[in-house]
Every structure is written in C-alpha cells, then in structure tokens.
C-alpha cells in the first residue's frame, strides 16, 4: 500500500512539474513574440540613410577586431533591409582572400555553404524572404564538413550587451550553432552585428539559447 501511494505521489509531482515547465515556456515564447514585434516596429522607423550610416560604422569597427582579422573561414549572413548591411563586409572578405560561407535554408534547417566571389553573389537567386542564397540542389562546399568556421557573424532582432540574442523565431541559428559547437573542436567566435536600437537591457531566454561573444554596434 505504501509503495502504491509513493508511486502515485511521484507521478503527481512529475505531472505538476511538467505543467509548470509548460507554463514557463509559454510565457517565454509570448514575451519573445511581443519583443520581436516591438523591435521590428522600431527598426522599420529608421530611414535608409541612418541604417547605412550605422552599417558603415559597424563595418569599420569589425575590421579592427582581432577576431575578424585573424579569422580565415568566416560565416556571413546576407542582409535584408532591416539588418546591418553586410555587402561591404563581403567585399572586404574577398579582398583579403578569406573564405566566406553564407546561409542556405532547406526546410527547417540551415547550412553554411561557400560563396566564391562577388560575381557569384550577384547571380544568386532570391528566396521567398527576399534573401539571396544558392539553389538548394546546387552542390557547394559545406563549412562544417570541410574544416569548420573561425568566425560566425550573426543577425537577429534584438540583443543585450552581454550576448543574449533574440532571433526571428524560426530557430535556424540556434540549431546551427548547436550543431557547430558539437562538430568543431575549436569553438568559433560568435559576433552579432546590430543597430543601436536593437540593444535591450534584457531578453527572455531559454536554456537552449547560446550566448554570443560580442554584440557589435556603432556605439
């Protein structure tokens, strides 16, 4: 009888704990959604000139970083109009004879594949998100299969000064970074590029969220 009561009590505890965790996760998800909407509204209000001004300042600061200068294999996102513009960074990488890998989205997964030149960039097709990427059926060198990455430059919706990141909600970078850290012996530098307005005091996070090494803004 005692044993049966103990089993029943233990199951009740497990159920209650599971319910609490579900409520916590639902609260985090709701808070993230609200912050995404707020930040996207703020970034939308920035004019093109201000976005470009901040982008160039971030580019200048990036070029002075040892983590960037000493890296050979670099992952770089191809920016949208509401992100720090990465076109000058891309040109600089090719000028310095570094190797660049860009995101290619396949369903719910993202891989980093090699980009060969600015001419290669110009010929890339657009996705439904209006982002350039190589065709999913095209054979390209995969960064994690050919030596890994030294540096990953990361986009996002919001950040904190100590490296917390809020993405767009699809989990592409979260899953990729997790895979990258498992596959590589050497941990790559993780640097976010952001507008001043994207910095927050805090961001709701879960245990699976990975902290960045640096959030680079104009300031």
Each model region followed by its residue ranges:
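Surface-exposed, charge/polar-rich loops and edge strands
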Residues: 24-30, 45, 135-143, 147-152, ...
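Active-site/ligand-binding-proximal alpha/beta "capping" segment
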Residues: 155-157
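N-terminal active-site beta-alpha-beta segment that forms phosphate/nucleotide-binding
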Residues: 26-148
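Short polar/charged helix/loop
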Residues: 169
């Amino acid at each position: 009888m005692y044993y049966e009561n103990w089993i029943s009590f233990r199951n009740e505890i497990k159920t209650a704990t599971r319910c609490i965790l579900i409520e916590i996760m639902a609260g985090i998800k709701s808070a993230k959604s609200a912050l995404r909407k707020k930040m996207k509204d703020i970034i939308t209000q920035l004019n093109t000139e201000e976005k470009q001004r901040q982008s160039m300042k971030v580019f200048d600061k990036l070029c002075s970083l040892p983590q960037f200068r000493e890296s050979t294999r670099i992952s770089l996102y191809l920016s949208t109009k509401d992100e720090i513009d990465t076109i000058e960074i891309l040109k600089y990488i090719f000028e310095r004879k570094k190797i660049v890998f860009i995101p290619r989205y396949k369903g719910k997964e993202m891989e980093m594949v090699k980009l060969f030149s600015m001419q290669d960039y110009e010929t890339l097709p657009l996705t439904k998100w209006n982002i350039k990427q190589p065709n999913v059926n095209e054979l390209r060198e995969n960064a994690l299969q050919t030596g890994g990455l030294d540096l990953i430059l990361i986009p996002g919706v919001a950040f904190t000064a100590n490296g917390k990141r809020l993405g767009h909600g699809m989990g592409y970078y979260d899953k990729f970074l997790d895979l990258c850290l498992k596959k590589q012996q050497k941990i790559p530098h993780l640097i976010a590029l952001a507008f001043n307005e994207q910095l927050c005091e805090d961001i709701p996070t879960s245990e699976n969220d990975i902290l960045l090494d640096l959030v680079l803004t104009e300031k």
